[in-house]
A protein has these predicted regions:
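Short loop/turn segments at beta->alpha junctions
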Residues: 95, 216, 280-283
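ABC transporter nucleotide-binding domain
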Residues: 171-264
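A structural detector for beta-sheet-dominated domains
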Residues: 10, 30, 230-232, 259, ...
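ABC transporter nucleotide-binding domains
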Residues: 4-9, 14-207, 212-213
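Alpha-helix C-terminal capping segments
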Residues: 104, 119, 236-241, 266-273
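A broad structural signal for short, well-ordered beta-strand segments within beta-sheet-rich domains
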Residues: 24, 224, 244-245, 274-278
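C-terminal coupling/interaction segments
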Residues: 258-309
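A structure-centric signal for secondary-structure junctions around beta-strands
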Residues: 3-4, 78, 224, 253
Length: 309
């Protein structure tokens, strides 16, 4: 693992019974990046994160985080990692101030300035008890407690799940603020694809336990194209087409979504004798949704993150 790679896995696999939850995962997360890790429910995202943090042993394969073997993470490595989940588990009887004072005792690099900054950003009162906080306020307090130790690597497991739009925006804005430090890395899973467009540099797509794409966000957006075909009558049957992610028929046309659309595919489409072929880009959200469709194939996009310089 190079100094520029913060997380790396090689063939990382975890079985629960006969079924793999994560299968042969090869992943590399560059230092200083904001890395989005997405997939449908049950795709293996949380299982992967738990393995990375040494909370769940892999069935086979290996990985490193901050240069340390994930099977044997020492305390000095854990002290450099901030971890936030959707549960936001806190002591209900404590106040926001109590939570900060309690946790600060365990972290020599604790920054009261960061803690207060995030708490203020979410409009939390220091004397408010955890049990009386809304879900969004609990998320804000959890984020403040995670960031105040000034972690080198921040791992977020869908922390905005279930938040209202205002609380979600506050959480995303806090992430944007964090990216100002070039040496900090953020690895986050999310169900909200709009979050990725706002903050992420890289995206990895996990589906049916396997990695399907891993590359810079801009490269992903550039690789996926929408193609509309118009015909004088009902559209003919499609031939086998490489890289086809989605196909939708209308009365006199088709809407197709491809990864790595090229001249060879266009020649194949021209054999259908359409009146018109119109090629256009998709939003990142639509491209990701298309990529997760049942028709898609695996590993169309070669990861540019696998071999960071």
């Amino acid at each position: 693992m190079s100094d520029q790679t913060v997380i790396q896995t090689r063939g990382l696999t975890r079985y629960f019974g006969p079924k793999p939850a994560v299968y042969e995962l090869n992943l590399a997360v560059p230092r200083g990046s904001v890395f989005a890790f997405i997939g449908r429910n049950g795709s293996g995202k949380s299982t992967t994160i738990r393995m990375l943090l040494g909370l769940l042993p892999p069935s086979r394969g290996d990985g490193t985080i901050l240069g340390f073997d994930i099977r044997r993470l020492p305390p000095q490595a854990r002290a450099r990692i901030g971890y936030l989940t959707e549960e936001h588990q806190l002591y209900g009887w404590m106040t926001a101030r109590d939570c900060g004072e309690f946790q600060s005792r365990f972290y020599p690099r604790w920054s009261e300035k960061i803690f207060q900054g995030v708490v203020d950003h979410f409009g939390l009162k220091p004397e408010a008890r955890v049990k009386d906080l809304s879900r969004g306020e609990r998320a804000g307090l959890s984020l403040a407690l995670t960031l105040a130790p000034d972690p080198e690597l921040l791992i977020l497991d869908d922390p905005a799940l279930g938040l209202d739009p205002v609380a979600r925006r506050a959480l995303v804005e806090s992430m944007i603020y964090l990216t100002r430090r070039s040496d900090r890395t953020i690895f986050f899973s999310t169900h909200d694809l709009a979050d990725i467009e706002r903050v992420a540099d890289y995206v990895a797509v996990l589906d049916h336990s396997a990695l399907r794409a891993c590359c810079p966000v801009e490269a992903f957006r550039n690789e996926v194209r929408q193609v509309r075909l118009r015909f004088a009558g009902p559209p003919p049957k499609l031939p086998p087409l490489p890289g086809l992610l989605q196909a939708t028929r209308t009365e006199n046309g088709m809407r197709l979504v491809f990864v790595r659309y090229n001249e060879g595919i266009e020649r194949s489409l021209n054999t259908l004798a359409p009146d018109q072929i119109e090629v256009s880009a998709l939003s990142l959200e639509d491209a990701l949704i298309s990529y997760l469709g049942e028709r898609g194939e695996k590993s169309f996009i070669l990861s540019e993150a696998e071999t960071p310089s």
